[in-house]
Amino acid sequence: MKIDITSLNGDSAGSIDLDDSIFGLEPRQDLIARMVRYQLAKRRAGTHKTKGRAEIARTGKKLYKQKGTGSARHGSARVPQFRGGGRAFGPVVRSHAHDLPKKVRALALKHALSAKAQGGGIIVWSDASATDAKTKALKASFAKAGLLSALIIDGAEVEQNFALAARNIPQIDVLPVQGINVYDILRREKLVLTRAAIDALEARFK
């Protein structure tokens, strides 16, 4: 797949052939969905908690005698059926993370990249750099290029001025290539890759 390379200002800088084994697959939505579920589950805090009957601060004394009252027999007042009692099978503090094989994760990333390429959502830049760490100037450049919602992936390190200028722009995410992930690719309209990012991705999946 051939795609044009541009600069941040929109100037043409040639073209590049994208590897079909990474960017030219027929997207599998099931793999992408599994990966998104894996990512979202892993980032959950899991700090939910309710008190069970053993944790309620209330007497454990038998409410009234077993027989002769005409009422249902009861023991502790901490049981779930009473107001103020413990919650039965309530949430506990835990990790929601689950396993997903490494090969499935790698394949899901390829399919997410292919889906974005198939929809015309990939833009290739020669590099991602800024002369000054000025958000206003960079935001104007993005608006001129029509980038209102984008994930920008650079090489192993993001140029400092560019990272500082872009970090406060809404719906613009900037990551080094090792941070690329399926969820962030899908949640933004455009995926911007630098030449360095493409070289790193092709080396990673070779």
From Swiss-Prot:
UniProt GO MF annotations: rRNA binding; structural constituent of ribosome
Membrane-crossing residue ranges in chain numbering: none
Biological process per Gene Ontology, one example term: translation
Family: Belongs to the universal ribosomal protein uL4 family.
Protein name: Large ribosomal subunit protein uL4
Top-level taxon of origin: Bacteria
Gene: rplD
Listed PANTHER family: 50S RIBOSOMAL PROTEIN L4 (PTHR10746), LARGE RIBOSOMAL SUBUNIT PROTEIN UL4M (PTHR10746:SF6)
HAMAP family membership: Ribosomal_uL4_B
GO CC term, one of those recorded: ribosome
Keywords: Ribonucleoprotein, Ribosomal protein, RNA-binding, rRNA-binding
Keyword rRNA-binding: yes
InterPro entries: Ribosomal_uL4 (IPR002136), Ribosomal_uL4-like (IPR013005), Ribosomal_uL4_dom_sf (IPR023574)
Disulfide bonds: none
Annotated organism of origin: Methylocella silvestris (strain DSM 15510 / CIP 108128 / LMG 27833 / NCIMB 13906 / BL2)
Keyword RNA-binding: yes
Task of the protein: One of the primary rRNA binding proteins, this protein initially binds near the 5'-end of the 23S rRNA. It is important during the early stages of 50S assembly. It makes multiple contacts with different domains of the 23S rRNA in the assembled 50S subunit and ribosome. Forms part of the polypeptide exit tunnel.
Complex formation: Part of the 50S ribosomal subunit.
